[in-house]
């Protein structure tokens, strides 16, 4: 069970926080994994729970290291770390969508401080001047630094919760994350940072390998990348049509696509639900581009197909864009809309600067060949074309890569 205090319940029961019930954690992953419909709301509760457990454990080990105030604030920081996410989470966290573009951390801070938002009023009433320390914990400017590292680091309660939750939601049975052993393995260094017991390297290996597999198999899944492209392209096309007075947008869609002075209060009214409703309605429009994207999303029919490439480098893949565009055009399609290029980049484990340290002060990389093998950046490139020319596209790509 997840137990919460009356103060935390009041935060959860604000309209600003309840909005997270309607922001899917994994954007469009449910097209590939039908049960992946969990939300930022449940993830935030889970992060709060893990932070509460970890703070309790550290206070047992270091009775004088954590004040009552910080013991109260750190779990609240975990609870609110994602409160600023846009609809569909990271998928719409881009200036391609928002006319008023800010990262979700910045939006979250504004939602916590803007007097028009109910969350701000509740935090001020409950915490008073401690709101400033709460914000410092969340942005990493507080000392001792382990208070912030619990919330945001390469081994934090955010990642621990979402990886377990995403595994369960997608059914991706890869890797192993032993939450109990990880939480029991954490210590506070003399310098005030969060470190891992040297004899618990293997539990961190399990966590990092699981994260690596989840990016390969879930977060970068081909249907996830394709449907995200459909949504972002739909909104970009809708903005274009609106600017040329060929499409009337709903109030909330105008706030996303055209309002360059979007307030925190108006931002807090944006959820997945209105985006889905608007996009699905566009399936009936006369514009073939917008209706094409919308129809595919509404029906899951007529999807573009991934061009399966032989082994290649990113540089080789980048050189395919122009010849594939020519192929698509010569086949009678519009290359601007019917050739979809998705490029994914993600940092793996990053040692040394912000890395995971052991209790002897060394980076965990030095003690684990397994972690060393998944450090650095991993990336991928995908091309999608109409199904009728997939075979031709694959033949062309193979010829060019093998040259």
Predicted regions and their residues:
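Histidine-centered, transition-metal-coordinating active-site segments
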Residues: 1-73, 83-403
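Alpha-helical scaffold segments that flank or form the walls of functional sites
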Residues: 76-77
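Aromatic-lined, polymer-binding surfaces characteristic
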Residues: 80
